[in-house]
Amino acid sequence: MPYVSPPGAGQTNIKSLNLYDDNIGTLHPTYVKLALMREKCRDVVSGQDIIKSKTTKYLPKLSGQDDASYKNYLNRALFFSIGAKSLQAIVGMASLKRPKVTAPTDIMEKYFNFTENLTFIEQYVRMVSEVSLQNQAYAYVEWPSNGGDAYTVILPAESVINWDYDDNGDFSLVVIKEDYWKKVSRYKREFVVRHRELTIENGNYVQNIFENNVKVKTITPMVLGQPLKKIPLVAFHSKGLGISDEPPLLLDIANINISHYMTSADLEHGRHFTGLPTPIITGASSDNKLYIGSNQFIVLPDKNANAKYLEFTGQGLASLEKALQEKQSMLASLSARLLDNSSKGSEATDAVKLRYLSETASLTTVVKTINVVLNMLYNIIAESLRESPKSVNIVLDTDFLGTQMSHTDMSALFEAYIGGAVDLDTLIYNLRVGQRLNPESTDEEVKAEILKRKNEIAEAAKKENPQPQPNNPQPNTSEK
């Protein structure tokens, strides 16, 4: 599932925030420019309940429609969460294979023990999800005040509301809007918003906590007994490091998804009224009660009277149905055809790859950028643990369209290995690229298993086909 931020994230009400006042809640102009677009994208991937809770924001009232009629109109509408499905597919492609990590033993045990701790994988999935959705995300390293292990914090685009740089281009100010549940009694929790300011004061990195625009706490993170000189935060987007002012990547999908939703509302509205035939009678008095049913008689006193059902005819609904199909096809194309139901028959592997190459180019760039960010973050952590600042190396897989090696190719590969045409390392490499190995296994484990089985086969062959023993001449006992 794609990451969905906690309550409040992405629900920016610009009118309620300070755009230009000089306080901790002031919004950066770039944040203001993108806020409504980001809110729309977040709502679309959050699903039907969130979309419908915004009522007329995404589904305007029809002309002359009262509240009761609009409520029925809204309830009948169907929001097809294609945006969420697209994001889910993108994240699934990016996280199909686990990363390869080399790091000092203690760091491997603390942060990259994927058998017992999936925190790193969850962080990676969230980073891909946020950048693929909003074209912006942030991450920084945090050190607990109690002296525990350092950890990374991933922030969605909506959380960082203001920032500034020093003369060297490094961050000198980052303001984070934090939504959290505050304990007000033993049983009661209250949802509140506070601000965390990451800044440089007197040459040192500090965090200032604000509640209701009042600073309530200052924290100075210490590493190896010394304060940091830079803010350990990295901003990144779909094309590299830094803060982008470009629209969210899923904005086009979100716009068509909402248009699809409005067309669905009109179609269901029309079906509701046209799908229920209305009985009418002409040429008869309306003074008496009339009944419909096989056990009742209807008497029409006038010879010209007539009774019938008024039913819908025409092409009005067909045009709405066609519009839905067209918009769904547009969504499928924009979301890399992941939802395309077109019948193309059985395509060769190379044909499938070529058809998707351009569509995965953006995802490849996103993953490569995140790869750089993760190495930056975990090498900051490594340095704080007295390790070399380049002792951690994380490699994320970008072969999203890799297909499984066929049985024929695998047999030919093993024959080449047995015949001496390829060495063992080449064999293992091709088996791994061809997705014929357990992703949890290491190359050393696979090598040991192949050699073990090779020896077992050789021993079994010796037993089935024993080598003939040479005839030893028997001593001549008759000679003295």
Residue ranges and their predicted role:
Residues 129, 250, 310, 314-322, ...:
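Short, charged/polar micro-motifs that form catalytic or ligand-binding hotspots
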Residues 1-152, 462-480:
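Extended, helix-rich architectural segments
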Residues 326-480:
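C-terminal helix-loop subdomains that flank or include functional centers
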Residues 128, 132-239:
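Extended, regular secondary-structure scaffolds
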Residues 15, 20, 35-37, 142, ...:
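A structural detector for beta-sheet-dominated domains
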Residues 218-349:
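Extended, charged amphipathic alpha-helical segments
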Residues 127-131, 256, 320-323, 327, ...:
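Amphipathic alpha-helix face/heptad-repeat signature
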